[in-house]
Amino acid sequence: MAENTVKQGGIADRMPGPDPDEQARQSLERIKHKFIIMSGKGGVGKTSVSVNLALALANKGYQVGLMDVDLHGPDIPHMLGLSGMLTADDSKKMVPIPYSDHLKIISMESLMPNRDEAIIWRGPVKHAAIRQFIGDVTWGDLDFLIIDSPPGTGDEPLTVAQLIPDAKAVIVTTPQEVALADIRKSISFCRNVRMDIFGIIENMSGFNCPHCGKVVDLFGTGGGEKTAHNHGIPFLGKIAFDPEMVQCGDTGLAFQKKFTQSPITLAFQEIADKMAG
């Protein structure tokens, strides 16, 4: 692997060259819109939302980068059916893995020969890794950079806030109160670091029974919308729960490609329109 790419246990030694912060700044200048997808807790489907928002934007013809900064639990390549390892170009910059002509990916999963090996890093190393994901990657000109962050308000979202000051947050929650309590912490985090909150998405909001057609509120309903209203934050929409979404993620198939007219596909398209608006 190239000298300046991320390695297990730390960051590879760099040859004398451009300042890494300046490289990151130059890379970001070529990206129009940056969104970090956050959640207050795990298990709310945040990564699935990240993947599907990126796909919805790419399907509309935008050039999209999907950056996985969930360094300890990277899943995006698997969810998109991508199994290759990252390579480097002649300038020793990492080349994102292409999913399509309009979507490319970078993730720790694509840097690890043994994907069962744990990443054991402290904050400064995570900061350096994310900075490399921005500045040492041949992103080129992008309309959108979608950043999938781990749950909570730790090192990774803080690093994004520091390195990408114009990033906007999309906060994902489910309707139940335990998730809503944590989303309020995400709102507080964004306001403390002065990150704009673009909006809130209520995921897993209702399940249409395939037998009787009745909508079953597995996790309650309306909590995300109410929280958005109470905090003066735009509510971007509801995404229903569908077992097919889980199946597609497990097998690396694009749900939106397989179910083009699903209410879920249409909901992601509507949110993508708001992001592009």
Where are these regions (language model features)?
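Phosphate-binding/switch loop-helix module in NTP-utilizing enzymes
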Residues: 112-160
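C-terminal boundary of histidine-terminating zinc-finger modules
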Residues: 251-262
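Walker A/P-loop phosphate-binding motif and the immediately C-terminal alpha-helix
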Residues: 34-70, 187
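Phosphate-binding loop that captures ATP/GTP phosphates
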Residues: 63-65, 69-115, 120, 127, ...
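Short glycine/serine/threonine-rich phosphate/pyrophosphate-binding segments
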Residues: 44-52, 73-77, 149-157, 179-182
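Conserved catalytic-core segment of NTP-binding enzymes
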Residues: 143-144, 150-248
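Glycine-rich phosphate-binding loops of nucleotide-dependent enzymes
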Residues: 106, 130, 149, 162, ...
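Extreme N-terminal, non-catalytic leader segments
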Residues: 1-41, 85
